[in-house]
Amino acid sequence: MAHAAQMGLQDATSPIMEELISFHDHALMIIFLISFLVLYALFLTLTTKLTNTNITDAQEMETVWTILPAIILVLIALPSLRILYLTDEINDPSFTIKAIGHQWYWAYEYTDYGGLIFNSYMLPPLFLEPGDLRLLEVDNRVVLPIEAPVRMMITSQDVLHSWTVPSLGLKTDAIPGRLNQTTFTATRPGVYYGQCSEICGANHSFMPIVLELIPLKIFEMGPVFTL
């Protein structure tokens, strides 16, 4: 999860997030090189006293500053399109979970396990235990297996919401009357936090998402669904 004074992204817990971190580093390197080139050109402009007032055109220079940005855009677009394709790819998910946004809590349905339905509310500060995280803990966590493809079906009962878990690289809008879907495969067990990422009213900041990822064998035993 995120912590104070954090400089980078959260640690990846899914292949998609690993791809996003790699793309972030790739784009950051290109931005750094562009910034260095611009600063170098400005430095030369400010320190060089020679001028030539007879230049009317510069075909070579215009060709360079037209082709070079096009190449840079292609270098950014190609890996971005690849990640977009991967996020939309759904390959025979093992489990399907439905998340429904409400003002201001989440409801979940385990349709593959007897139609289990429960609500997930943020825990008020008075109910927090030592070590719990303020504004991030919930009364009922979403328990899911690792190393198994999970499909999330996401919608809303009232206004626009957004189901977001940064460690998994997930951010899917919850839209009333529409069912969006996304898939992920978690690679590490643990507890991971997210929040609604679409301003949805007065208590928008109090819609945390908590995923508890456990080994598949433990998940299939069943008692994890006891609320």
Curated annotation (Swiss-Prot):
Listed GO biological process terms: ATP synthesis coupled electron transport
Residues that, per the record, bind Cu cation A2: C196, E198, C200, H204
Annotated keywords: Copper, Electron transport, Magnesium, Membrane, Metal-binding, Mitochondrion, Mitochondrion inner membrane, Respiratory chain, Translocase, Transmembrane, Transmembrane helix, Transport
Localization annotation: Mitochondrion inner membrane
Membrane topology listed for this record: Multi-pass membrane protein
Cofactor-binding details, from the entry: Binds a dinuclear copper A center per subunit.
Gene: MT-CO2
Protein name: Cytochrome c oxidase subunit 2
GO CC term (a single one): respiratory chain complex IV
Annotated family: Belongs to the cytochrome c oxidase subunit 2 family.
Residues holding Cu cation A1: H161, C196, C200, M207
Species of origin: Symphalangus syndactylus (Siamang)
Assembly with partners or alone: Component of the cytochrome c oxidase (complex IV, CIV), a multisubunit enzyme composed of 14 subunits. The complex is composed of a catalytic core of 3 subunits MT-CO1, MT-CO2 and MT-CO3, encoded in the mitochondrial DNA, and 11 supernumerary subunits COX4I, COX5A, COX5B, COX6A, COX6B, COX6C, COX7A, COX7B, COX7C, COX8 and NDUFA4, which are encoded in the nuclear genome.
Reactions catalysed, as given in the entry: 4 Fe(II)-[cytochrome c] + O2 + 8 H(+)(in) = 4 Fe(III)-[cytochrome c] + 2 H2O + 4 H(+)(out)
Mitochondrial matrix topological domain: 46-59
Main location per the UniProt record: mitochondrion
Signal peptide boundaries: none
InterPro entries tied to this protein: CcO_II, CcO_II-like_C, CcO_II_C, Copper_CuA, Cupredoxin, Cyt_c_oxidase_su2, Cyt_c_oxidase_su2_TM_dom, Cyt_c_oxidase_su2_TM_sf
Positions annotated to bind Mg(2+): E198
Top-tier EC class: translocase
Physiological role: Component of the cytochrome c oxidase, the last enzyme in the mitochondrial electron transport chain which drives oxidative phosphorylation. The respiratory chain contains 3 multisubunit complexes succinate dehydrogenase (complex II, CII), ubiquinol-cytochrome c oxidoreductase (cytochrome b-c1 complex, complex III, CIII) and cytochrome c oxidase (complex IV, CIV), that cooperate to transfer electrons derived from NADH and succinate to molecular oxygen, creating an electrochemical gradient over the inner membrane that drives transmembrane transport and the ATP synthase.
Example of a GO MF term: copper ion binding
Record-listed E.C. numbers: 7.1.1.9
Keyword Transport (UniProt): yes
Cofactor requirements of the protein: Cu cation
Transmembrane segments: 15-45, 60-87
